[in-house]
């Protein structure tokens, strides 16, 4: 079977290509399965696949030689799960994307008790998210991010264009809340964003305090600049290219003008620094302003070193395999594991592919 940890495009986007070659059941939480179905159906690569199975952290799936279990993790999308494969030799744990946030909302909370229970049951191997293993700055709570966002929205005099990843449900919820509390309406650009928002709303994973808060294109054009938030996620959930089009006057719905504030609410992907710098330059040339969240608050969806060490201390694995990240991130994670007493001979850094 295929076991999914969460519903972000980078976690489920390859599914249609996989299912094109291998017919296997797909398991995931309710929101994860709903988003997986959306990506598979919209790809037009696989037709008629329906072998989906919803799980919770209390689900146990028995196979002849192993049992698959789960525990809740904190990420920037609800219903995120880590995967535990219980074998006769011990547990094998794959964290998926995760971080720890002690102040997380209920939908995003980590089940620390369950993690400790898995650790007590002996962990043979841990495969853990290495994306932010090199970070020298720890994440702040997302509650602090929400406070900063609201303050920015209240002080902005013109339109606010928020750039974030399409499936970052947590950030979208924060934008919805800040727009409502600052007396603004929201316009969603693009069909992918609308579809993801509708899926999350239908499953009560996203809440809108006023049914008239989200407006269509014609309604947007009638609003004053200080009454509007535009949420831009771009194609394939990548907003930076879309911001460049807005700045150059080439966007099909919204172009930048004087008085606009572009709020970059996404943590740049690895190797995107040059693109971000060029984009900011184009925005300023269009007489707009830029607020980059990453410059004031560190809040990625990935565990920083202290979180990574806490996960290892809770699980106490015999073998450690850092996954997800550039080689230098994997190496940094391996060094953290060694600091905690895991010998290098028990640490394996995999190659890609």
Language-model segments: what does each one mean?
Residues 1-3, 8-222, 241-255, 274-277:
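His/Asp/Glu-rich metal-coordinating catalytic cores
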Residues 176-177, 181, 200-353:
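C-terminal regulatory/interaction regions
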């Amino acid at each position: 079977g295929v076991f999914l940890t969460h519903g972000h495009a980078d976690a489920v986007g390859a599914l249609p290509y996989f299912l094109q070659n291998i017919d296997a059941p797909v398991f995931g939480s309710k929101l994860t399965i709903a988003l997986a179905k959306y990506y598979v159906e919209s790809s037009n690569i696989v037709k008629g696949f329906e072998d989906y199975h919803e799980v919770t952290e209390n689900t146990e799936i028995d196979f002849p030689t192993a049992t698959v279990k789960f525990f809740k993790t904190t990420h920037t999308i609800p219903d995120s799960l880590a995967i535990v494969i219980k074998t006769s030799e011990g547990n094998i744990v794959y964290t998926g994307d995760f971080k720890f946030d002690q102040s997380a909302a209920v939908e995003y909370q980590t089940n620390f008790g369950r993690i400790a229970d898995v650790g007590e049951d002996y962990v043979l191997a841990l495969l853990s998210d290495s994306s932010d293993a090199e970070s020298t700055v720890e994440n702040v709570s997302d509650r602090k991010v929400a406070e900063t966002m609201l303050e920015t929205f209240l002080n902005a005099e013109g339109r606010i264009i928020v750039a974030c990843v399409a499936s970052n449900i947590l950030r979208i919820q924060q934008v919805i809340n800040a727009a409502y509390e600052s007396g603004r309406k929201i316009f969603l650009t693009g069909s992918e964003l609308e579809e993801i928002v509708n899926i999350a709303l239908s499953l009560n994973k996203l809440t809108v305090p006023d049914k008239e808060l989200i407006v269509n294109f014609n309604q947007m054009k009638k609003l004053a600049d200080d009454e509007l938030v535009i949420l831009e996620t771009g194609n394939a959930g990548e907003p930076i290219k879309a911001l460049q089009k807005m700045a150059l006057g080439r966007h099909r719905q919204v172009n930048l003008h004087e008085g606009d504030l572009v709020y970059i609410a996404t943590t740049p992907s690895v190797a995107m620094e040059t693109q971000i710098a060029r984009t900011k330059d184009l925005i300023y040339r269009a007489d707009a302003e830029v607020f980059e969240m990453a410059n004031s608050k560190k809040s990625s969806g990935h565990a920083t070193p202290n979180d990574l060490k806490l996960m290892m201390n809770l699980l106490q694995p015999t073998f450690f395999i850092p996954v997800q990240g550039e080689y230098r991130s994997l190496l940094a994670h391996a060094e953290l594991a060694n600091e905690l007493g895991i010998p290098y001979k028990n640490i394996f850094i995999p190659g890609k592919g």
